[in-house]
Amino acid sequence: MENCLSTLVFLLSIALVLFPKTGVSFLAAEGASDSDSKVYIVYLGEREHDDPELFTASHHQMLESLLQSKDDAHNSLIYSYQYGFSGFAALLTSSQAKKISEHPEVIHVIPNRILKLKTTRTWDHLGLSPNPTSFSSSSSAKGLLHETNMGSEAIIGVVDTGIWPESKVFNDHGLGPIPQRWRGKCESGEQFNAKIHCNNKLIGAKYYLSGLLAETGGKFNRTIIQDFKSNRDAIGHGTHTATIAGGSFVPNVSFYGLARGTVRGGAPRARIASYKVCWNVVGYDGICTVADMWKAFDDAIHDQVDVLSVSIGAGIPENSEVDSVDFIAAFHAVAKGITVVAAGGNDGPGAQNITNAAPWLLTVAATTLDRSFPTKITLGNNQTLFAESLFTGPEISTSLAFLDSDHNVDVKGKTILEFDSTHPSSIAGRGVVAVILAKKPDDLLARYNSIPYIFTDYEIGTHILQYIRTTRSPTVRISAATTLNGQPAMTKVAEFSSRGPNSVSPAILKPDIAAPGVSILAAVSPLDPDAFNGFGLYSGTSMSTPVVSGIIALLKSLHPNWSPAAMRSALVTTAWRTSPSGEPIFAQGSNKKLADPFDYGGGLVNPDKAAQPGLVYDMGIKDYINYMCSAGYIDSSISRVLGKKTKCTIPKPSILDINLPSITIPNLEKEVTLTRTVTNVGPIKSVYKAVIESPLGITLTVNPTTLVFNSAAKRVLTFSVKAKTSHKVNSGYFFGSLTWTDGVHDVIIPVSVKTTISM
């Protein structure tokens, strides 16, 4: 770690957490000359007062002092951050940026860089249903949904690509007045009329474009930005994520007949505020800038949202102190009681690629659902095999051919077999009727134009290839896919889901939690060519993130005084370590294995259990100060971030003592002792006993082994954990757990330990 705040807030660009494409060539070149102005974010820390006009005036004055001209200062200023924190975005040359960074009130100057780009059954699967399910007896009229009136008083802020407001998922039927605390607004714009398109469901709609335009010549060039100059969603991503988090009930929805059911969000009566920061740039899934993101966070803090759902992130961590969706802006939101839920990224299954790793973010991994779309393949010898697809018929009956890497095969009118193709467009226009694609298992299904793609694994693919090579005139029949819910489909951590350990702060476990994020059905923009009646199946941690955001909205309704850290603790300590049906959860990858904390954090989110966790590992500003101090940040910088004088203790606090609902020891030499503090949020008189599952070769001891809560005044207790290794050589990570149980509540935290032997 670097011992300076500048590295702490090193924020690169922001990209939708979907799938990667190429770089952004139309933006200002990295090697621009000093005379070229670019966007820089000048961060000044916590606000010193509550008058936003005074902040804007002071930002103008600082720029005027730098540029020696009122007009130049006015023209330079892009955004003034004035609600959640103090700072501004401005067009500056590199020398001007360097000069202003030396101002005594400036904490850091951050370049507004942009990089390349890298959701129906979900709620039944998680036991969060209006009707009881086989997995959760508590999902009834007394369940979390009903206890919170489905989140009717919660406000979910969605920072994304905007909203398609006409979608039925944003109807406000049966909703009461907008919560009185709401201070936001709807902004009209291109094909978006605030008076028509906003209602008691969609209560906020804003868009942020200045940061992007400043990087692209200052004009809204429609040959580059093919989007609406408003909150209207041209991509569909924001509409999809908003649906998952808080969409209203829409019955009898399907994707070409598949996955039929009722679409709704996790908090179906919650209010939605949409903050559009990502734009449809030609050749990309969506482009967003840090400057626009900061302003959206700033406004959301002012608007008083309860949770921010952010399916956005930077790339794989490199050398930055924090590779985060927005480290500083998110910190200020959390400090003001807003839970920020962020996508962990889609760079799995390799290790150490988790993004959005700040300790105050709730970082989400993605799992599959217990749902599949089996597709019957019948070979000409009457052998029947099963694959998966989104093919909905009618039945295909053709000759069958193998397409090798040279593609030197007559494929017209045939079904072809391919292995590991990543270029489906390569067979377009060649008259192919269907494609059977053999690949490693990842549960990712797709439709490619009008050609049906049938997905299978290598074993079945090899079986089909053997049939082709031993048959004079091979043929195949492909039946329409069907929808299968429940067993035998297993819950798995998705292959694409980014994994820990946390390469930025190894002692901070990331991801925190996992949720369904594969083939999630939700509303999209009808402009999406793959949409069916305004709905689509998307995959990514972009989809698992709003699942958790919707659950947080319900928890906030039930426990309005809980902090964001308490919310996270409730999710982590009550999560499923097996699937809801009791089967093991595996992690997809080159070698399928049982999932561990680096795959899914605490486990698969369990909404009803999280409502009554018993104990929580709470955190506040003091814990975040300890985090910064333990990483070596100087007192003056921390003081400016917090807006009050702060002094780190001597010796500096241990990062192992940060009160997380997890224990991660990345370099255990012999033994170490750490502390945790729990807050009783259950019955006043409770007794909890420790149950330890030590990692292999590690001895864990807890002191005390019993926690006795006997009064309202005694709700907070601290305990210590000693970890001692018996390994004689450097080891990889081994995993265990620590559970506090009172016979009703099992409060479980994951333990991850790696032994490091000094040379």
Swiss-Prot record:
GO molecular function: serine-type endopeptidase activity
Localization: Secreted
List of glycosylated residues: 221, 252, 353, 382
Prosequence residues removed at maturation: 26-118
Record-annotated Inhibitor I9 domain positions: 39-117
Residue ranges of every copy of the Peptidase S8 domain listed in the record: 122-611
EC number: 3.4.21.-
Signal peptide location: 1-25
Predominant location category: secreted
Entry-linked Pfam families: fn3_6, Inhibitor_I9, Peptidase_S8
Stored InterPro entries: Peptidase_S8/S53_dom, Peptidase_S8/S53_dom_sf, Peptidase_S8_Ser-AS, Peptidase_S8_subtilisin-rel, Peptidases_S8_3, S8pro/Inhibitor_I9, S8pro/Inhibitor_I9_sf, SBT
GO cellular component term, pick one: cytosol
GO biological process: proteolysis
Swiss-Prot/TrEMBL keywords: Autocatalytic cleavage, Glycoprotein, Hydrolase, Protease, Secreted, Serine protease, Signal, Zymogen
Active site annotation, chain numbering: 160, 237, 542
EC category name: hydrolase
Family the UniProt entry places it in: Belongs to the peptidase S8 family.
PANTHER family: PROPROTEIN CONVERTASE SUBTILISIN/KEXIN (PTHR10795)
Record's protein name: Subtilisin-like protease SBT3.14
